[in-house]
Amino acid sequence: MSFVIVARDALAAAAADLAQIGSAVNAGNLAAANPTTAVAAAAADEVSAALAALFGAHAREYQAAAAQAAAYHEQFVHRLSAAATSYAVTEVTIATSLRGALGSAPASVSDGFQAFVYGPIHATGQQWINSPVGEALAPIVNAPTNVLLGRDLIGNGVTGTAAAPNGGPGGLLFGDGGAGYTGGNGGSAGLIGNGGTGGAGFAGGVGGMGGTGGWLMGNGGMGGAGGVGGNGGAGGQALLFGNGGLGGAGGAGGVDGAIGRGGWFIGTGGMATIGGGGNGQSIVIDFVRHGQTPGNAAMLIDTAVPGPGLTALGQQQAQAIANALAAKGPYAGIFDSQLIRTQQTAAPLANLLGMAPQVLPGLNEIHAGIFEDLPQISPAGLLYLVGPIAWTLGFPIVPMLAPGSTDVNGIVFNRAFTGAVQTIYDASLANPVVAADGNITSVAYSSAFTIGVGTMMNVDNPHPLLLLTHPVPNTGAVVVQGNPEGGWTLVSWDGIPVGPASLPTALFVDVRELITAPQYAAYDIWESLFTGDPAAVINAVRDGADEVGAAVVQFPHAVADDVIDATGHPYLSGLPIGLPSLIP
């Protein structure tokens, strides 16, 4: 066989279609089993009983034949899926060979590993799984792990179905992940094996992601092809030894999926990316604190969702800030939190502009736990402040000292907050309305501490003391500008302009970036230990090492750049000092 042309996407789609047909037939057989195998006699006479017994016997024979046919059908679908995966692996091998021919030393090492180490091991394992002896012994070999863990020891994962679109995981010791059903993700391998191929997208849908390769060695699965107008699915990643899977082909009008990340030690593939999407376009976000609430008036800690509404004064404040903001519009979007007070504060501006605010949980106030409804000026109020203040100083791992808080530490809080900011950014680019000042601007209504802590943890010109010396008042605004990729700059704080970072502030940010990376890495590794998934643990360790390594490498360059670029800008001027009122 010198030349073979195979439409691998069509082959994978055919396997998914056959699996769907099999699922439908099996469902019909099961639905007909009870009424046909247990036919009730029409009457109490012997003839009726004999006829019922005859029809029941025929039905039981049919069910036995149908079960055998279903087994053959499942085996055929698995073989067809395996064939599609085999062709996909061949394409990966060819692609990596081409990269090696172009002079890529890592690709050459990976090619050698694939050809002389992993390739033979994988081929031998698949031969055993598909051999008559392997199929006969599989129920015995896999019984213990199926009972204890619900997963085969040796074997390939099942193909996804309409009811369960994602491919099943491969055997714990050896086995490839199953192929995804239409739009489903490929299954992950166990210790050794390839990830399953993602399912093809349907009717403009995105192709499924390829499955993750084996914990020790194995290639990521290929992403599923996109439907018409849909993007291809991303290729699955390899963990320690193996190549990342190819991205699925995009449908007409879509784009191809990204190549999966190669193995940590040996492997080729795409690079991991940190951060959100976007094209680097800068936007402005006006963070606006809500109007006065009864809790504010009584100086109580009030953070729980949904919380109280606005006082009469708060409603007046909401209308006043709406009138002021409307004159500076139009806006790309309006956002608020799950708290009633932020929604009531956002409503007047939304009504003036005919817009519907989007609710983002990441804009909720930092949760006070058991300190809820206690006085702000009290030991509870001080303990509530300790953790968030530490977060702004570069220690997000410090826990919230309010028992019962859902924001257990600064890492949890900041990921929710930056997730909300990412959503605001994406929505703003999707509706790039330019405000009166020429910037794409969105308005986000939130609470004092979330606005203050969230901005100080992320802007490149922070001034954490502002949280204590100039807390944001009701309907006060904090303005930031930038994007998730290039970073954010604090433009103004409650109407007071904030200049670029001074040299000490810039150096503080450099140190902050250096010391926060290992904190995030340690927390992610700690969390991964509770998943019980070795792949999750390996990924957390790998991602953490990458993040810490990048921070260490970047630190001296950032310091040198800041020292060279230092120009002595006046940082802050005219900021009044007042009694803190940090808790809304």
UniProtKB/Swiss-Prot annotation:
<dbReference type="GO" id="GO:0001666">
    <property type="term" value="P:response to hypoxia"/>
</dbReference>
<comment type="subunit">
    <text>Interacts with human TLR2.</text>
</comment>
<dbReference type="Pfam" id="PF00934">
    <property type="entry name" value="PE"/>
</dbReference>
<protein>
    <recommendedName>
        <fullName>PE-PGRS family protein PE_PGRS11</fullName>
        <ecNumber>5.4.2.12</ecNumber>
    </recommendedName>
</protein>
<dbReference type="GO" id="GO:0005737">
    <property type="term" value="C:cytoplasm"/>
</dbReference>
<keyword id="KW-0134">Cell wall</keyword>
<feature type="domain" description="PE">
    <location>
        <begin position="1"/>
        <end position="92"/>
    </location>
</feature>
<dbReference type="GO" id="GO:0004619">
    <property type="term" value="F:phosphoglycerate mutase activity"/>
</dbReference>
<feature type="active site" description="Proton donor/acceptor">
    <location>
        <position position="365"/>
    </location>
</feature>
<keyword id="KW-0413">Isomerase</keyword>
<dbReference type="InterPro" id="IPR050275">
    <property type="entry name" value="PGM_Phosphatase"/>
</dbReference>
<dbReference type="GO" id="GO:0000287">
    <property type="term" value="F:magnesium ion binding"/>
</dbReference>
<keyword id="KW-0843">Virulence</keyword>
<keyword id="KW-0460">Magnesium</keyword>
<keyword id="KW-0346">Stress response</keyword>
<dbReference type="Pfam" id="PF00300">
    <property type="entry name" value="His_Phos_1"/>
</dbReference>
<dbReference type="InterPro" id="IPR013078">
    <property type="entry name" value="His_Pase_superF_clade-1"/>
</dbReference>
<comment type="function">
    <text>Induces maturation and activation of human dendritic cells (DCs), via TLR2-dependent activation of ERK1/2, p38 MAPK, and NF-kappa-B signaling pathways, and enhances the ability of DCs to stimulate CD4(+) T cells. By activating DCs, could potentially contribute to the initiation of innate immune responses during tuberculosis infection and hence regulate the clinical course of tuberculosis. Involved in resistance to oxidative stress, via TLR2-dependent activation of the PI3K-ERK1/2-NF-kappa-B signaling pathway and expression of COX-2 and Bcl2.</text>
</comment>
<dbReference type="GO" id="GO:0009986">
    <property type="term" value="C:cell surface"/>
</dbReference>
<keyword id="KW-0964">Secreted</keyword>
<dbReference type="GO" id="GO:0016791">
    <property type="term" value="F:phosphatase activity"/>
</dbReference>
<dbReference type="GO" id="GO:0005576">
    <property type="term" value="C:extracellular region"/>
</dbReference>
<dbReference type="InterPro" id="IPR000084">
    <property type="entry name" value="PE-PGRS_N"/>
</dbReference>
<dbReference type="Pfam" id="PF21526">
    <property type="entry name" value="PGRS"/>
</dbReference>
<feature type="active site" description="Tele-phosphohistidine intermediate">
    <location>
        <position position="290"/>
    </location>
</feature>
<feature type="region of interest" description="Phosphoglycerate mutase">
    <location>
        <begin position="384"/>
        <end position="584"/>
    </location>
</feature>
<dbReference type="GO" id="GO:0009274">
    <property type="term" value="C:peptidoglycan-based cell wall"/>
</dbReference>
<dbReference type="InterPro" id="IPR029033">
    <property type="entry name" value="His_PPase_superfam"/>
</dbReference>
<dbReference type="GO" id="GO:0006096">
    <property type="term" value="P:glycolytic process"/>
</dbReference>
<comment type="similarity">
    <text>In the N-terminal section; belongs to the mycobacterial PE family. PGRS subfamily.</text>
</comment>
<dbReference type="InterPro" id="IPR048996">
    <property type="entry name" value="PGRS_rpt"/>
</dbReference>
<comment type="similarity">
    <text>In the C-terminal section; belongs to the phosphoglycerate mutase family.</text>
</comment>
